[in-house]
């Protein structure tokens, strides 16, 4: 991934024409100067996250016009839905509880530029309180706002349907006041994904039905099956779900933290994804998951498995059992990270597509980033792999040199020294890996997405 010496990446010696002291302003700088923030919380969220997003966009090859478009969407549409700062409600979409996560997707074939994505759970001041204990109000509010933005091909109908089918209702929230459910500290019920593609933003929805399943004493697989049956007339048959359900039922593969995803497009065109997790982080389990216990045997599946094992070895992932019980790892609470995967299902297709998520949160960033750099170069993406380590260091400056902020001040200090990756283990969060004949390797890297790094003292001790 090449660091551009353009508006997004200005060296200290690169100065504006006719000015011997002022650096060229970035897209982030321009928006920071011109935007009127409703309150100090929004301003701090922008300062702590916006410049990182600008850097990621630039390094992924987004030209200034595309970066301006993406950052304008972020500052105008998403920033108002991040709620109070510092965040009080802990979101299930990240290990730290942060309600957003930036990632970059790479595709081996097709000469496709990287795509920057944002995982996002909208939050408000009432999130997690008695007013909105399961953070459901901001999700509907953001969905309503997206509907009036005229995003090409955006269709909220599946999101609204699954919100009703998969998330706790008023009666169930009353029962939850009286009945403690294991894992219920993960109270998130739904979230969004935004792919910042060249021609339009692509929107995905996520639901987290685990609490509703457990409360109603239903198995996750049967619960999902019942929820998609009413859609059959509108969407068509989904035979791949039967294969997925058979494998997961036979191997006790439905985790209590399983969740669901879909594209916010015409339901007949949407992909459906079933996510699960496992605490046994060993290659033999990965191979079983990838092939659905031997049910998927095509040459393409086997080719993908070879690449998957190569990346597994290059990242030097620690193998063994990880005691994940649904908690967070945010500098206060510490829990290990499990393996996660999803099965992508399309209307009328007999076989699902497996996507595996490497549990790299808590692993050496140096090993992970070094392994990723080698892998990108080996699969023909050397224009990103050759400079990947330098690019990530540029994203994530040395947190230990950041000044302690006053109330409502930004702590961002992007001129501070680059972070020593050999001493960190949580700058990178996940690597997702899929493989198809059309795309070849389809890989995404997820990053801790704020200049606040809550694990600094923990990692200095270790």
UniProtKB/Swiss-Prot annotation:
InterPro entries the record matches: Aro_prenylTrfase, Aro_prenylTrfase_DMATS, DMATS-type_fun
Positions of brevianamide F binding: 101
Superkingdom of this protein's organism: Eukaryota
UniProt pathway: Alkaloid biosynthesis
Site (Required for regioselectivity): 119
Gene Ontology molecular function terms on file: prenyltransferase activity
One record GO biological process: alkaloid metabolic process
Top class in the EC scheme: transferase
Listed EC numbers: 2.5.1.-
Keywords: Alkaloid metabolism, Prenyltransferase, Transferase
Cysteine disulfide links: none
Residues the record lists as binding dimethylallyl diphosphate: 117, 204, 206, 273, 275, 357, 442, 446
Function comment: Prenyltransferase; part of the gene cluster that mediates the biosynthesis of paraherquamide, a fungal indole alkaloid that belongs to a family of natural products containing a characteristic bicyclo[2.2.2]diazaoctane core. The first steps in the biosynthesis of paraherquamide is the production of the beta-methyl-proline precursor from L-isoleucine. They require oxidation of a terminally hydroxylated L-isoleucine to the corresponding aldehyde by enzymes which have still to be identified.
Family from the record: Belongs to the tryptophan dimethylallyltransferase family.
Name used for this protein in its record: Prenyltransferase phqI
Record organism: Penicillium fellutanum
Gene it is expressed from: phqI
């Amino acid at each position: 991934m090449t660091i551009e010496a353009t508006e997004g990446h200005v060296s200290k010696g690169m100065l504006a024409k006719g000015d011997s002291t002022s650096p060229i302003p970035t897209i982030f700088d321009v928006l920071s100067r011109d935007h009127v923030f409703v309150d100090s919380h929004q301003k701090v969220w922008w300062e702590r996250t916006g410049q990182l997003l600008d850097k990621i966009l630039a390094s992924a090859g987004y030209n200034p016009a595309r970066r301006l478009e993406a950052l304008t969407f972020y500052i105008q549409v998403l920033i108002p839905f991040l709620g109070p700062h510092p965040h009080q409600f802990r979101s299930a979409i990240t290990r730290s509880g942060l309600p957003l996560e930036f990632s970059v997707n790479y595709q081996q074939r097709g000469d496709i530029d990287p795509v920057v994505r944002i995982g996002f759970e909208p939050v408000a001041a009432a999130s997690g309180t008695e007013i909105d204990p399961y953070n459901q109000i901001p999700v509907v509010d953001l969905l309503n706002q997206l509907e009036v933005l005229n995003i090409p091909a955006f269709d909220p109908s599946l999101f609204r349907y699954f919100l009703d089918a998969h998330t706790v209702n008023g009666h169930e929230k009353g029962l939850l006041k009286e009945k403690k459910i294991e894992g219920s500290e993960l109270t998130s019920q739904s979230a969004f994904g935004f792919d910042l593609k060249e021609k339009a933003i692509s929107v995905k929805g996520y639901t987290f039905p685990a609490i509703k399943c457990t409360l109603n004493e239903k198995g996750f697989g049967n619960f999902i099956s019942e929820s998609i049956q009413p859609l059959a007339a509108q969407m068509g048959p989904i035979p791949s779900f039967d294969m997925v359900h058979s494998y997961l039922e036979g191997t006790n593969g439905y985790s209590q933290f399983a969740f669901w995803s879909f594209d916010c497009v015409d339901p007949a065109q949407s992909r459906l994804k079933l996510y699960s997790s496992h605490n046994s982080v060993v290659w033999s389990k990965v191979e079983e998951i990838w092939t659905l216990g031997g049910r998927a045997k095509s040459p393409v599946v086997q080719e993908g498995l070879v690449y998957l094992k190569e990346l597994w070895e290059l990242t030097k992932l620690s193998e063994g059992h990880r005691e994940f019980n649904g908690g967070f790892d945010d500098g206060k609470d510490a829990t290990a990270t499990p393996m996660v995967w999803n099965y992508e299902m399309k209307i009328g297709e007999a076989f699902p597509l497996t996507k595996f998520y490497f549990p790299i949160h808590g692993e050496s960033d140096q090993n992970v980033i070094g392994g990723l750099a080698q892998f990108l170069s080996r699969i023909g993406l050397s224009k990103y792999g050759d400079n990947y380590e330098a690019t990530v260091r540029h994203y994530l400056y040395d947190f230990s040199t950041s000044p302690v902020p006053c109330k409502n001040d930004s702590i961002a200090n992007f001129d501070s020294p680059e972070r020593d990756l050999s001493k960190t283990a949580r700058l990178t969060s996940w690597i997702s890996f899929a493989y198809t004949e059309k795309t070849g390797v389809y890989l995404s890297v997820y990053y801790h997405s704020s200049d606040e790094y809550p694990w600094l003292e923990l990692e200095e001790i270790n």
